[in-house]
Design a protein with these regions (language model features):
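Sec-exported extracytoplasmic/periplasmic mature domains
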Residues: 43-51, 78, 93, 100-101, ...
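N-terminal segment of the mature folded domain
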Residues: 11-155
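Short helix-loop capping/hinge motifs at secondary-structure junctions, enriched
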Residues: 126-133, 168-176, 263-273
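Extracellular/periplasmic juxtamembrane helices and adjacent flexible linkers that interface
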Residues: 1-9, 262-334
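Periplasmic-binding protein-like
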Residues: 109, 113-121, 189-190, 236-265, ...
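Short beta-strand->loop
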Residues: 29-31, 143-186, 192-198
Length: 334
């Protein structure tokens, strides 16, 4: 063990010696839920002596709500948010699809998923029996009984992912990727519009989750990711919502890492950002994400909790960017 440690230290010194251009600060903007675990990964990367374009890259992680980041990236970056990022990791393709549509030249290559978390229904404990055997296909027609809130905004990827799952079910895709034409079809638009129109009012997913812990029956459920519900329930005792997994192919937040090619950053920043993504997706390096309740390739599923089973989920093939945008627009129009 002493020899291995010594070798690692020597490798680090050798790598540092090749950083002929010095250190390079590389900003990474991420969804707030990713901040803690990705800071741990960044510390490991920064200490590894990694060299990018003759620099020693130093990753700096900052949390920004995805709608705020999207507005800044598609418009003028606000310095109050921090330095311009070279890498953006939001919750889902809901955000990267819009960036790619607005400024395609600023997204370098295809974003890479660094983790995933399927959408579930967070259900009030007393209402749980009414959700037995429920399917994504059923949700629009049973909304009066199920009373599912469908918030939009910064923490509401669950709503948009649930919409993808429902759209695939009513569009009869059999788990295949939903196309833009299918997302705009009358049957899909009509089903989602009806589902949203009858939804209980709720400003945010966080507010809906809080409401589910209090007495009442106006609101019985809200779609969120597994990780979101597990994080909310942590340390709250028994009076928390429980996850229900509707039957059928299920969409997931995929935490896409998009390398950004902007005027304010250099090729060296882009290279370092891409190198960090590669490091993050190598076996074992994303363990902090798994420990935080995300599903990570090569890591065991998170441990079952009183609220979330983290069981087997039938995956839904990712929808096209055009379909994602169309479904978001449908849910936001109600």
């Amino acid at each position: 063990m002493v020899w291995l440690s010594g070798r690692s230290e020597q490798e680090g010194r050798d790598a540092a010696a090749s950083c002929v251009r010095g250190d390079l600060a590389v900003q990474v903007a991420v969804a707030p839920a990713l901040v803690g675990p990705l800071q741990r990964v960044a510390e490991s990367f920064n200490g590894s002596g990694a060299v990018s374009a003759d620099y020693c890259a130093k990753i700096e992680v900052m949390g920004i709500d995805s709608p705020v980041a999207l507005n800044a990236l598609t418009g003028t970056w606000d310095p109050k948010l921090g330095p311009v990022p070279s890498l953006w990791i939001p919750e889902s393709t809901v955000w990267t699809a819009r960036l790619a549509a607005a400024k395609p030249a600023e997204v370098s290559g295809q974003p890479t998923s660094v983790a995933s978390s399927p959408v579930v229904l967070a259900v009030r404990g007393s209402a749980r029996p009414g959700f037995d055997g429920v399917r994504w296909l059923d949700l629009p027609t049973r909304q009066e009984q199920l009373r599912i809130a469908l918030p939009t905004g910064a923490d509401a990827d669950g709503t948009y992912l649930a919409a993808q799952s429902v759209a695939a079910a009513v569009g009869r895709t059999a788990g295949a990727a939903l196309s833009e034409d299918a997302a705009k079809s009358p049957v899909v638009v009509g089903s989602l519009s009806r589902w949203g129109k009858d939804a209980p009012k709720s400003t945010t997913a966080g507010a809906a989750l809080e409401a589910l812990t209090r007495p009442g029956d106006v609101l019985r459920a809200v779609p969120v990711t597994e990780q979101q519900l597990a994080a909310f329930a942590r340390g709250r005792g028994d009076a928390v919502p429980v996850a229900v997994y509707p039957e059928g192919p299920t969409a997931a937040a995929t935490y896409p890492a998009a390398v950004l090619d902007r005027e304010e950053t250099t090729d060296a920043h882009d290279r370092a950002a891409a190198d960090f993504v590669t490091y993050l997706t190598e076996r074992g390096n994303a363990k902090p994400l798994a420990e935080a309740g995300f599903r990570v390739v090569g890591q065991p599923a998170p441990a079952k909790t009183a609220s979330v089973e983290f069981g087997t989920v039938e995956p839904l093939a990712p929808a096209s960017n055009g379909a994602v945008i169309s479904l978001v627009d449908t849910m936001n129009r109600r």
